[in-house]
């Protein structure tokens, strides 16, 4: 495996960024920690890339922790888009294959690579994400509050919840 642990990955990214003169990317906070309730999603299987944050463990939603050892690939996009897409496609198809209804992105970087670049990920894996989609934490919270986020229309992977 190319990046066995996150420390090795971080060092490799740092090395490539220095060589290629790429500015450090913004750090994205884990938006999953902002979720306050999930009563309407008890019947859904929700995949998350990493471990379940403590604030979500009390909810009765059916979370599937992918515990991905590899990063989503976002930091590699400018240096090696093909490798970034391979990393991301492994994660999104692990979520798809797990039987999850959707993947919950923990930040904008994950949303960008998993949804905005979904067609490239499908091509990279030579597979189709039929009837699968990605949600932002803010969109999930809005849906929980019976609101329809306007951004759902802009998703590459079309959201079909109800």
Each PLM stretch: what is its role?
Residues 1-162:
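Iron-sulfur cluster-binding electron-transfer modules in prokaryotic oxidoreductases
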């Amino acid at each position: 495996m190319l990046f066995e642990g996150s420390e090795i990955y971080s060092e490799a990214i740092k090395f490539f960024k220095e060589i290629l003169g790429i500015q450090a990317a913004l750090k994205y906070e884990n938006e999953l920690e902002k979720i306050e309730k999930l009563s309407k999603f008890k019947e859904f299987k929700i995949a998350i890339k990493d471990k379940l944050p403590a604030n979500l463990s009390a909810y009765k939603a059916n979370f599937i922790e992918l515990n991905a050892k590899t990063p989503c690939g976002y930091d590699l996009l400018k240096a090696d888009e093909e490798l970034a897409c391979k990393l991301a496609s492994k994660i999104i198809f692990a979520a798809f294959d797990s039987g999850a209804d959707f993947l919950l992105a923990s930040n904008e970087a994950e949303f960008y690579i998993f949804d905005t670049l979904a067609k490239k990920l499908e091509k990279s894996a030579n597979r189709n994400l039929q009837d699968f989609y990605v949600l932002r934490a803010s969109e999930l919270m809005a849906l929980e509050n019976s609101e329809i986020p306007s951004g759902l229309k802009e998703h590459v992977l079309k959201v079909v919840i109800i």
